[in-house]
Regions:
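Hydrophobic/aromatic residues located in beta-strands of well-ordered beta-sheets
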Residues: 183-185
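A conserved acidic beta->alpha catalytic loop
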Residues: 187-196
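Short, acidic, metal-binding catalytic loop of nucleotide-sugar glycosyltransferases
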Residues: 169-180, 191
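Secondary-structure boundary/capping signal
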Residues: 162, 180-181
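Short alpha-helix adjacent to the SAM-binding motif of class I
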Residues: 167-168, 195-197
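N-proximal low-complexity "stem/linker" segments adjacent to membrane-targeting elements
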Residues: 3, 9-11, 15-67, 71, ...
């Protein structure tokens, strides 16, 4: 069976940009920067990914993708315990937990997601064991059964990214009109002014 990745782990460029949108953690949890970002979870520390960017919300995804055979792959190294959690809106349930003593080697743990339509959200929790562990990646995948016509969309939070957004809009405005994508700009934080947008 073929699988398609529909969501991956998102991490900020720096810990100062987290604001609880990417991850929540106990004292000692650190963002490791570089080309392949990761999270370090110290011994007895916890990181919880029930957040805006890293929680998985089945009802929203069901509008755009088939959620058959849904599973979550978590890549870690070091010593940690990985849990798949979900909420039905009233309580939090741990669907599966696996202890990983991978040392320096990366190890991937796969969780099958039971009946995603009856859950409001799924997320991963990681607890650091002896000498701590690293959360390297998370991918949410589903079976590919049929092709669907797709209109691609790129979404970016404009908060503290005004220069990048304006720069990209200027580049797009210089494209040939036939190849130029349609742009919808929603500035919820009201940080952009009308004269800034090309």
């Amino acid at each position: 069976m073929k699988y398609k990745t529909i969501q991956t782990l998102m991490l900020p460029d720096s810990e100062e940009e987290n604001y609880g949108l990417y991850y929540q953690g106990t004292e000692g949890v650190r963002l490791i920067g570089g080309e392949e970002k990761s999270l370090y979870i110290p011994e007895n520390g916890n990181v919880d990914l029930f957040t805006y960017f890293n929680g998985f919300y089945p009802k929203q995804w069901a509008q755009y993708a088939e959620l058959n055979g849904l599973h979550v792959k978590v890549t870690v190294s070091g010593s940690c315990s990985v849990s798949l959690c979900h909420t039905d809106g009233k309580r939090t349930v741990v669907n599966g937990e696996e202890e990983c003593l991978a040392g320096d080697e990366e190890r991937t743990v796969t969780f099958e997601v039971p009946d995603p339509q009856h859950s409001k959200a799924f997320w991963i929790c990681v607890k650091g064991l002896k000498q701590g562990g690293y959360l390297r990646n998370i991918t949410v995948q589903t079976e590919v059964e049929r092709l669907q016509e797709v209109n691609l969309a790129a979404v970016i939070c404009t908060c503290r990214r005004e220069k990048e957004v304006i720069g990209n809009l200027e580049r797009i405005s210089r494209m040939d009109i036939k190849e130029r994508p349609e742009i919808f700009l929603i500035d919820n934080g009201n940080t952009l002014t009308e004269y800034m947008v090309p």
